[in-house]
Regions:
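Alpha-helical transmembrane segments and their helix-helix packing motifs
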Residues: 1-244
Protein backbone atom coordinates (compact mmCIF):
# COMPACT_ATOMS: atom_id res chain seq x y z
CA UNK A 1 0.00 0.00 0.00
CA UNK A 2 1.30 3.47 -0.89
CA UNK A 3 2.43 5.47 2.13
CA UNK A 4 0.13 8.39 1.24
CA UNK A 5 -2.96 6.18 1.23
CA UNK A 6 -1.97 4.52 4.50
CA UNK A 7 -1.27 7.89 6.12
CA UNK A 8 -4.58 9.37 5.01
CA UNK A 9 -6.56 6.40 6.31
CA UNK A 10 -4.68 6.56 9.60
CA UNK A 11 -5.48 10.24 10.04
CA UNK A 12 -9.10 9.83 9.02
CA UNK A 13 -9.41 7.37 11.89
CA UNK A 14 -7.78 9.81 14.30
CA UNK A 15 -9.75 12.86 13.20
CA UNK A 16 -13.12 11.14 13.39
CA UNK A 17 -12.34 9.74 16.83
CA UNK A 18 -11.05 13.15 17.96
CA UNK A 19 -14.26 14.86 16.88
CA UNK A 20 -16.30 12.29 18.81
CA UNK A 21 -14.13 12.56 21.93
CA UNK A 22 -14.27 16.35 21.95
CA UNK A 23 -18.04 16.29 21.47
CA UNK A 24 -18.43 13.86 24.37
CA UNK A 25 -16.25 15.99 26.65
CA UNK A 26 -18.22 19.13 25.85
CA UNK A 27 -21.63 17.53 26.22
CA UNK A 28 -20.83 15.72 29.47
CA UNK A 29 -19.17 18.80 30.95
CA UNK A 30 -22.14 20.96 29.99
CA UNK A 31 -24.56 18.68 31.83
CA UNK A 32 -22.15 18.11 34.73
CA UNK A 33 -21.96 21.84 35.40
CA UNK A 34 -25.74 22.15 35.30
CA UNK A 35 -26.19 19.20 37.66
CA UNK A 36 -23.18 19.82 39.95
CA UNK A 37 -24.04 19.30 43.63
CA UNK A 38 -23.76 22.17 46.08
CA UNK A 39 -21.21 21.36 48.79
CA UNK A 40 -21.89 23.50 51.90
CA UNK A 41 -18.75 24.99 53.40
CA UNK A 42 -16.51 24.11 50.46
CA UNK A 43 -14.61 27.33 49.92
CA UNK A 44 -12.51 28.00 46.88
CA UNK A 45 -14.03 25.20 44.81
CA UNK A 46 -14.84 26.20 41.28
CA UNK A 47 -18.23 24.88 40.28
CA UNK A 48 -17.64 25.53 36.61
CA UNK A 49 -15.08 22.99 35.41
CA UNK A 50 -14.34 24.28 31.92
CA UNK A 51 -10.62 25.02 32.21
CA UNK A 52 -9.62 21.32 32.62
CA UNK A 53 -11.00 20.63 29.15
CA UNK A 54 -8.26 22.83 27.73
CA UNK A 55 -5.64 20.74 29.52
CA UNK A 56 -7.23 17.60 28.11
CA UNK A 57 -6.92 18.88 24.57
CA UNK A 58 -3.54 20.58 25.14
CA UNK A 59 -5.00 23.85 23.86
CA UNK A 60 -4.66 26.22 26.80
CA UNK A 61 -1.82 28.28 25.36
CA UNK A 62 -3.57 28.89 22.05
CA UNK A 63 -6.88 29.48 23.84
CA UNK A 64 -5.39 32.25 25.99
CA UNK A 65 -4.34 34.11 22.86
CA UNK A 66 -8.01 34.60 22.00
CA UNK A 67 -9.86 34.62 25.34
CA UNK A 68 -9.32 36.15 28.77
CA UNK A 69 -11.25 33.54 30.73
CA UNK A 70 -12.43 29.95 30.43
CA UNK A 71 -16.18 29.66 30.93
CA UNK A 72 -19.29 27.99 29.60
CA UNK A 73 -19.24 30.01 26.41
CA UNK A 74 -15.60 30.53 25.47
CA UNK A 75 -14.42 26.93 25.95
CA UNK A 76 -17.27 25.33 23.95
CA UNK A 77 -16.79 27.88 21.18
CA UNK A 78 -13.05 27.16 21.08
CA UNK A 79 -13.33 23.38 21.16
CA UNK A 80 -16.30 23.10 18.84
CA UNK A 81 -15.66 25.42 15.94
CA UNK A 82 -13.20 28.29 16.52
CA UNK A 83 -11.38 28.84 13.19
CA UNK A 84 -7.97 29.15 14.90
CA UNK A 85 -8.24 25.82 16.74
CA UNK A 86 -6.78 23.06 14.59
CA UNK A 87 -8.16 20.38 16.94
CA UNK A 88 -11.76 21.58 17.12
CA UNK A 89 -14.69 19.41 16.09
CA UNK A 90 -15.08 21.48 12.95
CA UNK A 91 -11.38 21.24 12.05
CA UNK A 92 -11.27 17.49 12.73
CA UNK A 93 -14.26 16.81 10.48
CA UNK A 94 -12.91 19.10 7.77
CA UNK A 95 -9.52 17.37 7.78
CA UNK A 96 -11.08 13.91 7.76
CA UNK A 97 -13.23 14.90 4.79
CA UNK A 98 -10.25 16.36 2.93
CA UNK A 99 -8.23 13.17 3.42
CA UNK A 100 -11.21 11.04 2.37
CA UNK A 101 -11.75 13.14 -0.75
CA UNK A 102 -8.40 11.96 -2.06
CA UNK A 103 -9.31 8.33 -1.34
CA UNK A 104 -12.65 8.11 -3.10
CA UNK A 105 -11.48 5.01 -4.96
CA UNK A 106 -10.23 3.37 -1.73
CA UNK A 107 -13.24 3.81 0.55
CA UNK A 108 -16.90 2.98 0.04
CA UNK A 109 -19.35 5.52 -1.33
CA UNK A 110 -21.29 5.32 1.93
CA UNK A 111 -18.21 6.26 3.97
CA UNK A 112 -17.63 9.31 1.81
CA UNK A 113 -21.29 10.37 1.93
CA UNK A 114 -21.34 10.12 5.73
CA UNK A 115 -18.23 12.26 6.11
CA UNK A 116 -19.39 14.80 3.57
CA UNK A 117 -22.82 15.10 5.20
CA UNK A 118 -21.28 15.58 8.65
CA UNK A 119 -18.99 18.27 7.25
CA UNK A 120 -21.85 20.17 5.61
CA UNK A 121 -24.13 19.92 8.64
CA UNK A 122 -21.64 20.66 11.42
CA UNK A 123 -18.99 22.93 9.93
CA UNK A 124 -21.28 25.75 8.81
CA UNK A 125 -24.10 27.78 10.38
CA UNK A 126 -22.77 27.50 13.93
CA UNK A 127 -24.11 30.86 15.16
CA UNK A 128 -26.84 29.37 17.36
CA UNK A 129 -24.90 26.43 18.76
CA UNK A 130 -24.19 28.21 22.05
CA UNK A 131 -27.82 29.23 22.57
CA UNK A 132 -30.18 27.21 24.80
CA UNK A 133 -29.66 23.49 24.07
CA UNK A 134 -27.74 24.10 20.86
CA UNK A 135 -24.44 22.80 22.25
CA UNK A 136 -26.01 19.52 23.35
CA UNK A 137 -27.63 19.00 19.95
CA UNK A 138 -24.40 19.86 18.15
CA UNK A 139 -22.38 17.40 20.23
CA UNK A 140 -24.94 14.64 19.78
CA UNK A 141 -24.84 15.17 16.01
CA UNK A 142 -21.02 15.00 16.01
CA UNK A 143 -20.98 11.78 18.04
CA UNK A 144 -23.66 10.18 15.89
CA UNK A 145 -21.73 11.09 12.73
CA UNK A 146 -18.65 9.35 14.15
CA UNK A 147 -20.64 6.28 15.15
CA UNK A 148 -22.27 6.11 11.74
CA UNK A 149 -18.96 6.43 9.93
CA UNK A 150 -17.34 3.73 12.09
CA UNK A 151 -20.28 1.39 11.56
CA UNK A 152 -20.28 1.89 7.80
CA UNK A 153 -16.51 1.42 7.64
CA UNK A 154 -16.86 -1.82 9.60
CA UNK A 155 -19.58 -3.03 7.25
CA UNK A 156 -18.11 -1.97 3.91
CA UNK A 157 -14.31 -1.68 4.06
CA UNK A 158 -12.29 -4.75 3.02
CA UNK A 159 -10.05 -6.18 5.74
CA UNK A 160 -6.81 -5.31 3.99
CA UNK A 161 -4.01 -3.02 5.17
CA UNK A 162 -6.20 0.04 4.66
CA UNK A 163 -8.66 -1.20 7.27
CA UNK A 164 -5.90 -1.71 9.82
CA UNK A 165 -4.42 1.74 9.27
CA UNK A 166 -7.86 3.29 9.76
CA UNK A 167 -8.36 1.22 12.90
CA UNK A 168 -4.88 2.07 14.22
CA UNK A 169 -5.59 5.79 13.96
CA UNK A 170 -8.90 5.42 15.75
CA UNK A 171 -7.51 3.30 18.56
CA UNK A 172 -4.42 5.45 19.19
CA UNK A 173 -6.56 8.58 19.41
CA UNK A 174 -8.91 6.78 21.80
CA UNK A 175 -6.08 5.62 24.07
CA UNK A 176 -4.56 9.10 24.13
CA UNK A 177 -7.92 10.57 25.14
CA UNK A 178 -8.47 8.10 28.00
CA UNK A 179 -4.96 8.66 29.38
CA UNK A 180 -5.38 12.44 29.28
CA UNK A 181 -8.73 12.14 31.06
CA UNK A 182 -7.25 10.04 33.84
CA UNK A 183 -4.29 12.38 34.25
CA UNK A 184 -6.45 15.49 34.58
CA UNK A 185 -8.86 13.65 36.86
CA UNK A 186 -5.97 12.71 39.16
CA UNK A 187 -4.76 16.31 39.26
CA UNK A 188 -8.24 17.53 40.20
CA UNK A 189 -8.30 15.25 43.24
CA UNK A 190 -4.93 16.36 44.66
CA UNK A 191 -5.34 18.54 47.74
CA UNK A 192 -9.14 18.42 47.64
CA UNK A 193 -10.68 19.72 50.86
CA UNK A 194 -12.35 16.99 52.96
CA UNK A 195 -15.67 18.85 52.85
CA UNK A 196 -15.56 18.63 49.05
CA UNK A 197 -15.31 14.86 48.88
CA UNK A 198 -18.97 14.87 47.93
CA UNK A 199 -17.86 16.05 44.51
CA UNK A 200 -15.88 12.88 43.91
CA UNK A 201 -18.89 10.79 42.94
CA UNK A 202 -20.07 13.53 40.59
CA UNK A 203 -16.67 13.83 38.93
CA UNK A 204 -16.31 10.06 38.64
CA UNK A 205 -19.65 9.84 36.88
CA UNK A 206 -18.65 12.63 34.47
CA UNK A 207 -15.35 10.90 33.71
CA UNK A 208 -17.02 7.60 32.87
CA UNK A 209 -19.70 9.26 30.76
CA UNK A 210 -17.01 11.14 28.82
CA UNK A 211 -15.82 7.82 27.40
CA UNK A 212 -19.26 6.14 27.25
CA UNK A 213 -18.26 3.85 30.10
CA UNK A 214 -20.73 4.63 32.88
CA UNK A 215 -23.20 1.81 32.23
CA UNK A 216 -20.44 -0.72 31.54
CA UNK A 217 -18.66 0.23 34.78
CA UNK A 218 -21.88 -0.03 36.80
CA UNK A 219 -22.57 -3.51 35.46
CA UNK A 220 -19.11 -4.58 36.59
CA UNK A 221 -18.91 -2.70 39.91
CA UNK A 222 -21.87 -2.14 42.23
CA UNK A 223 -19.94 0.14 44.56
CA UNK A 224 -19.14 3.82 44.97
CA UNK A 225 -17.38 5.54 42.09
CA UNK A 226 -13.89 5.33 43.55
CA UNK A 227 -11.08 6.86 41.52
CA UNK A 228 -8.91 3.75 41.82
CA UNK A 229 -11.64 1.44 40.50
CA UNK A 230 -12.46 3.79 37.65
CA UNK A 231 -8.80 4.02 36.63
CA UNK A 232 -8.39 0.24 36.77
CA UNK A 233 -11.50 -0.24 34.64
CA UNK A 234 -10.46 2.27 31.97
CA UNK A 235 -6.88 1.02 31.86
CA UNK A 236 -7.14 -2.73 32.26
CA UNK A 237 -10.62 -4.07 31.61
CA UNK A 238 -10.24 -6.72 28.87
CA UNK A 239 -13.84 -6.55 27.66
CA UNK A 240 -14.60 -2.83 27.48
CA UNK A 241 -13.72 -1.58 23.95
CA UNK A 242 -12.50 1.82 25.13
CA UNK A 243 -10.11 0.63 27.82
CA UNK A 244 -6.41 1.16 27.22
Amino acid sequence: MLSRIAENLYWIGRYIERAENTASLLDVNYHANVEAPVVPGAKGIVTEQWAPLLALTDDEGAFREHYDRADGRTVPEWLAFHPQNSSSIRASLARAREDARGLRDRISLEMWETLNRAYLELCFSTERVLEQDGLHEYCVAAREASHLFSGIAYATLPRDLGWYFLLAGQQLERVDNVLRLLQVREQQGVGLEPVARGLENHRGMALLKSVSAYEAFRKRHHVALEARRIAAFLLLDPDFPRSV
